[in-house]
Amino acid sequence: MLILTRRVGETLMIGDEVTVTVLGVKGNQVRIGVNAPKEVSVHREEIYQRIQNEKSDPSSESGNF
């Protein structure tokens, strides 16, 4: 794992097309902005896990009884 230190307003690059910018820090929360091409999915980890679980178990989708 690469560990970086950034201040508010500073940006890091992932590849040539994805940027992550620190927008603010308040207590133990950090606001970040992500700029990425439309074909690159960007999700919080818990949302990503939910999407993966729904892909692996289609019967778990709401409305399917």
Swiss-Prot record:
One of its GO terms (cellular component) is cytosol. Keywords: Activator, Cytoplasm, Repressor, RNA-binding, Translation regulation. One of its GO terms (biological process) is regulation of carbohydrate metabolic process. SUPFAM superfamilies: CsrA-like. It is found in: Cytoplasm. PANTHER family: CARBON STORAGE REGULATOR. This is Translational regulator CsrA. It comes from Shewanella denitrificans (strain OS217 / ATCC BAA-1090 / DSM 15013).
